[in-house]
């Protein structure tokens, strides 16, 4: 959440903000700041962060930016709210040269909450205590890297029993599976990490690779119900099914699922049915498939014009029969799969003013979701929210008339946002990746 520097206060969506003239000091007309819509910044103004709008906020950089990452479930427990937090990420870089790319395991720890400003009139002794406290509160990052030839388009992590693995889509047109157990071990042990970086990292290779796609791709999803079952989709409109075999390998069906006419952008397995998945494409469609049918006949349902242009991302709710989609048109759409044949979403939200790059339902709260866009916004939403008619905000401030009432929070400050994920074990914690690096935060709204 940001505010205009030099103005009285920040505001959340739907809350008015009084402005003060820099020349006269007099109060101007109350306004709502809407990112991407105005009012535009005047000369000498800039946006500043309102730390009181965040429970937690940290940033990290890893050298080359990462186009994709996934959160690795850990053994530290579920529903963790006590600070400081520890979390693990698996990410892949997009370096300037193919030889400079890395698959990485990150351990972020000692992640404290935002600290309230010191009270006015605090003495020197209190300031010294604050400096010592700041040192103890510094966030920490451990990083284990594996060389990878080619930029990494997408990373998705799954557990095969007790074995964590990462599916990796390469810009070189190959999909690989890497075992992650050793990487998880070394980021927890500084001595083991030093040994790994010195002696082991250059020797670490994928445990399986598939080069049968006709080019590069981005779509990839592990089944949440059948361990090891994987889908991969490419920019040539093809989707392939991976089936795990004995001995830790995979059989990849060479017959692609037929239906899309352009690049397959995203894939999502059903969280309730073993054989059903959804796909979206640059052909503007969303399709529902059943792998029990032959690949040429497996498409069961189609919404041909789901968005006005490319459908970039989809996410299947684990709590409701809802599919969330985001497109090049900047729209966010919620589809009730019980009514998917109608071809109409049950809700459409238009806050983003550039293509949507990532969407995800909250893992614990069925009506809450987050989205990121090429407009450098991360938005948080709640389908259950309705505007209070007695509040009268829309009448008193015309800027609220077009503001979606389900919009909870707008986060800014990143550059070229690519992907976000809710942490499945730390309620309300969001992680994003962008050209500007990683951000871990939790807002006061979720």
Curated annotation (Swiss-Prot):
Ranges occupied by WD repeats: 212-252, 259-299, 306-345, 351-391, 412-445
Q: Which GO terms describe its molecular function?
A: chromatin binding; DNA replication origin binding; histone binding
Q: Which SUPFAM superfamilies match?
A: WD40 repeat-like
* Residues with Phosphoserine modification: 122, 344
Q: Where is this region: Disordered?
A: 1-42, 110-141
- As stated in the Swiss-Prot or TrEMBL entry, residues carrying the post-translational modification Phosphothreonine are 10
Coiled coil feature spans: none
Q: Tell me, how does this one assemble?
A: Interacts with METTL18. Interacts with CDT1; origin binding of GRWD1 is dependent on CDT1. Interacts with CDC6; origin binding of GRWD1 is dependent on CDC6. Binds to histone H2A-H2B and H3-H4 complexes.
Q: What is this protein called?
A: Glutamate-rich WD repeat-containing protein 1
**From which source organism is this entry?**
Bos taurus (Bovine)
């Amino acid at each position: 959440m940001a505010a205009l520097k030099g103005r009285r206060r920040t505001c959340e969506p739907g809350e008015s903000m009084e402005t003060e003239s820099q020349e006269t000091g007099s109060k101007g007309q109350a306004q709502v700041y809407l990112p991407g819509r105005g009012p535009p910044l005047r000369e000498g103004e800039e946006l500043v962060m309102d730390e009181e709008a965040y429970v937690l906020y940290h940033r990290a950089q890893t050298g080359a930016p990462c186009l994709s990452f996934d959160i690795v479930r850990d053994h530290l427990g579920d529903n963790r709210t006590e600070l400081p937090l520890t979390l693990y990420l698996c990410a892949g870089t997009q370096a300037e040269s193919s030889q400079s790319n890395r698959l990485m395991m990150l351990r972020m720890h000692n992640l404290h909450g935002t600290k309230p400003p010191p009270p006015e009139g605090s003495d020197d002794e209190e300031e010294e205590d604050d400096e010592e406290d700041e040192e103890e509160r510094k966030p920490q990052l451990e990083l284990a890297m594996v060389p990878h030839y080619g930029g990494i388009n997408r990373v998705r992590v799954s557990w095969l029993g007790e074995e964590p693995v990462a599916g990796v889509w390469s810009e070189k047109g190959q999909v690989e599976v890497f075992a992650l157990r050793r990487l998880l071990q070394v980021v927890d042990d500084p001595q083991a990490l030093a040994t790994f970086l010195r002696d082991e990292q250059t020797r670490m290779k994928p445990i399986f690779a598939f080069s049968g796609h006709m080019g590069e791709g981005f779509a990839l999803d592990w089944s949440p119900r059948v361990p090891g079952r994987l889908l991969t989709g490419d920019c040539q409109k093809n989707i392939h099914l991976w089936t795990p075999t004995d001995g830790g390998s995979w059989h990849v069906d060479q017959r692609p699922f037929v239906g899309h006419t352009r690049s397959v952008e995203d894939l999502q397995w059903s969280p309730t049915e073993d054989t059903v998945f959804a796909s979206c494409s640059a052909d503007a469609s969303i399709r529902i498939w059943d792998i029990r049918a032959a690949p040429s006949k497996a498409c069961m349902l189609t919404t041909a014009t789901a968005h006005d242009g490319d459908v970039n991302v989809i996410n299947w709710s684990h709590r409701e029969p809802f599919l969330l989609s985001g497109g090049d048109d900047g729209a966010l759409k919620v589809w009730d799969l019980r009514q998917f044949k109608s071809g109409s979403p049950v809700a459409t939200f238009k806050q983003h003013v550039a293509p949507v790059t990532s969407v995800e339902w909250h893992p614990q709260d069925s009506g809450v979701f987050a989205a990121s866009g090429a407009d450098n916004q991360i938005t948080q939403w709640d389908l259950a929210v309705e505007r209070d008619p007695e509040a009268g905000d829309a009448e008193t401030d015309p800027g609220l008339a077009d503001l979606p009432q389900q919009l909870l929070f707008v986060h800014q400050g990143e550059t070229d946002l690519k992907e976000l994920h809710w942490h499945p074990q730390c309620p309300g914690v969001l992680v994003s990746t962008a050209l500007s690096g990683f951000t871990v935060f939790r807002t006061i709204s979720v």
